[in-house]
């Protein structure tokens, strides 16, 4: 879900081509969830293999990722969530309830042959389980793509990697990486440049965005600590927000009073009792420092065995992805040679 601060975000629209040669730390769970939600049959059922195992996320990971890399020259390091923080239990419970409600409504829509409604409810039913995550990691290994297993929040790990300068930016649809200290966040990096709206049965243009944390903080004349306090007022994955306080009101409060402790009594008494612990989640996140984002050669045999023999993918389609990976490897070799010649000329 993430924190809702969109109304106050300072963003700039960018062309995907401007990311050429950059490496992004991808919020892998967020990306895979998007694939699970949108890659479906007309009645809303996820793609599956002959054993009934979901493959929608694998199709998205293989074909859309390689397309972005070939078309725009961007690199990816995928970051997976570790065990959830105990304070996230409320959010996880809300998601379960929403899925259960959507499943009932999906079944009712199918009985009415209302496939548009069924499709929109199926999107909400999406659940990324450990088997799917294991399959995604296996696919990335076959592709030679780097991935990092975070000890806690994947967004915190991605932000750390960006802050260290090991990647250029974090890549997620949520804004939480900014709270965790990522200097840059890239949103809406897609192949089609459009977003499908299941409930309306239509789509809208989706333009990639770049958000730079220093620019955002400077624009609003706040610190990152105050940004975190603002998020706590609005609501995060670790606490419910205060009723009646949206992003704009929260911004005014932190600008006027400086911190949660200094807010008026009628605000302070409605704060979560553990707000200092929530601050700590963002300011002192649980991350790992021993990671590698080196891209390795793909293993073609591994790709065909896993996808075609075990998961029922078409060899012709997998061959397309293999050709893209070859092109990516060749491009990297040529770029490395150009850099070497430049350094030794």
Where are these regions (language model features)?
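Noncatalytic, basic helical substrate-engagement surface that gates or grips nucleic-acid strands
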Residues: 2-14, 18-164, 183, 191
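Conserved NTP-donor binding/palm subdomain of two-metal-ion nucleotidyltransferases/polymerases, i.e.
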Residues: 51, 177-180, 191-203, 212
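Non-catalytic nucleic-acid-binding/docking modules located in mid-to-C-terminal regions
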Residues: 3, 9, 13-20, 201-345
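Glycine-enriched alpha-helix->loop->beta-strand junction motifs that scaffold or abut catalytic
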Residues: 166-168
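Charged, glycine/proline-rich intrinsically disordered loops and linkers
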Residues: 104-120, 197-215
């Amino acid at each position: 879900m993430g924190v809702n601060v969109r109304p106050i975000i300072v963003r700039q629209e960018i062309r995907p081509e401007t990311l050429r040669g950059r490496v992004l730390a991808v919020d892998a769970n967020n990306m895979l969830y998007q694939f699970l939600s949108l890659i479906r049959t007309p009645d809303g059922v996820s793609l599956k293999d002959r054993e009934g195992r979901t493959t929608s996320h694998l199709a998205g990971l293989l074909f859309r990722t390689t397309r972005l890399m070939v078309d725009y020259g961007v690199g990816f390091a995928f970051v997976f969530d570790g065990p959830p923080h105990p304070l996230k239990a409320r959010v996880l419970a809300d998601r379960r309830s929403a899925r259960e409600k959507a499943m009932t409504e999906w079944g009712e829509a199918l009985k009415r042959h209302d496939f548009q409604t069924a499709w929109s409810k199926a999107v909400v039913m999406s659940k990324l389980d450990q088997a799917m995550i294991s399959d995604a990691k296996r696919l990335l290994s076959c592709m030679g793509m780097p991935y990092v297993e975070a000890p806690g929040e994947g967004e915190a790990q991605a932000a750390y990697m960006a802050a260290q300068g090991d990647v250029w930016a974090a890549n997620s649809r949520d804004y939480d990486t900014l709270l965790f200290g990522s200097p840059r966040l890239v949103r809406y990096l897609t192949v089609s440049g459009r977003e499908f709206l299941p409930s309306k049965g239509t789509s809208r243009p989706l333009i990639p965005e770049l958000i730079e944390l220093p620019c955002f903080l400077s624009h609003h004349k706040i610190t990152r600590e105050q940004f975190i306090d603002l998020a706590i007022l609005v609501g995060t994955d670790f606490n419910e927000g205060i009723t009646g306080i949206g992003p704009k009101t929260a911004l005014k409060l932190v600008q006027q009073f400086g911190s949660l402790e200094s807010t008026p009594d009628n605000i302070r008494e409605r704060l979560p009792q553990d707000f200092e612990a929530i601050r700590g989640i963002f300011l002192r996140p649980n991350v790992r420092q021993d990671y590698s984002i080196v891209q390795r050669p793909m293993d073609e045999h591994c790709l065909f065995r896993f996808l075609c023999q075990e998961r029922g993918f078409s060899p012709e389609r997998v061959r397309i992805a293999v050709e893209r990976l070859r092109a990516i490897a060749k491009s990297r070799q040529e770029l490395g040679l150009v850099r070497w010649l430049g350094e030794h000329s």
